[in-house]
Amino acid sequence: MDKLFIKSDVLLKDSFQLAWNVYESGFEPNYIIGVWRGGAPVGIAVQEFLNVLGIKSDHVAIRTSYYSGIGERKDSVQVYGLNYVIRQLESEDRLLIVDDVHDTGNSVAQIIADIAAACKKNTPEIKIATPYYKPNKSQTGNKPDYYIHEPAQWLVFPHELDGLSLEEIIENKPELANLIDKIKHHI
């Protein structure tokens, strides 16, 4: 499997660029959802950057459950942690959903469906932002409103270790160099 190892500084740079793209578009979200796990650091950077530019927003992380391992998916997407946002949202609000990658689109589609079902007439304007978009993997036809890259490879984000070989960790995770001797028998 061809893998793209994303460095933390590159992800942060892309997150700030993503925020700038949102800002330049004129969309001013007053709510931002970062999709836990990978969308949380991207969402934090987007929120911070927009805040510096004068766009204030309430921001939370929610969780979806869909992947059970590299390339292995469960049958349906479960969304956790939307209660706070649903209680707050009004129809005139603007919600930005931020994730690390938009591939099948199923997770974001389920988040939007759950928000729409709960908010009904109070469903706000919703836009999607992600540094990485995989149009060839889409199962929903949804396209993020804001994205930076269209990679074909399997993405390995800075925090990800599960499913990597010891050789991949040594080669692509220099931040672990001082711990390799201590952890190699666990891998």
Ranges and model annotations:
Residues 1-187:
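PRPP-associated nucleotide enzymes
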